[in-house]
């Protein structure tokens, strides 16, 4: 009984995590319709500028130890996959000041963004949660939990997409 309850909970969490998808737009466009994203200089980010490349959007928080743990491997993966057209975007729903202070204190050279809506309102219920979008803006992979982004297995998977 306990096992069934856990499986049902997991199933509903996965369904919830993909709830931002709208069949009329690409998954990436649908995500942007649900929320607006700004960079640390408070410029709006238009996801259409990534139409010809692959995008990894990772949802995280400054208080999330597993999120912080995977950031160095995200940076290494970004460098390894430079010739494969990948852009890595790290999205938080915290304040610009909090994200900027975190970036400066941790000295992470990554693309940090702020979502203007709470994660729950766009269907993200666990952190870190990462979505990989192909060149057409379609979700091709979803990861919930810590990923060793620079592992041979993940790098090969991303190269093959």
What residues fall within each predicted segment?
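Positively charged n-region of N-terminal signal peptides that target proteins for export
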Residues: 1-4
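Bacterial N-terminal signal peptides
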Residues: 7-15
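N-proximal helix/coil linker or "cap" segments that precede and/or mark the start of modular domains
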Residues: 14-34
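A short beta-strand-turn-helix
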Residues: 34-55
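Short pre-active-site segment immediately N-terminal to redox-active cysteine/selenocysteine motifs
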Residues: 53-55, 59-63, 95, 126
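Conserved redox-active cysteine motifs that mediate thiol-disulfide chemistry
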Residues: 59-76
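Short, internal strand/loop/helix patches
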Residues: 89, 100-135, 144
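Thiol-/selenol-based redox modules, centered on thioredoxin-like
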Residues: 132-161
């Amino acid at each position: 009984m306990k096992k069934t309850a856990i499986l049902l909970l997991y199933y509903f969490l996965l369904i919830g995590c993909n709830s931002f998808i709208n069949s009329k737009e690409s998954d990436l466009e649908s995500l942007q319709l649900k929320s607006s994203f700004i960079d640390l200089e408070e410029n709006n980010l238009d996801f259409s500028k990534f139409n010809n490349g692959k995008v990894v959007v990772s949802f995280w928080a400054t208080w999330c130890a597993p999120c912080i743990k995977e950031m160095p491997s995200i940076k290494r993966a970004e460098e390894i996959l430079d010739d494969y057209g990948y852009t890595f975007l790290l999205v938080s729903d915290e304040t610009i000041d909090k994200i900027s202070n975190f970036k400066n204190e941790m000295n992470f050279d990554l693309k940090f963004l702020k979502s203007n809506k709470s994660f729950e309102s766009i269907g993200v219920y666990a952190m870190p949660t990462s979505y990989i979008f192909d060149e057409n803006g379609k979700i091709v992979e979803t990861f919930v939990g810590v990923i060793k982004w620079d592992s041979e297995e993940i790098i090969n998977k991303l190269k093959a997409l």
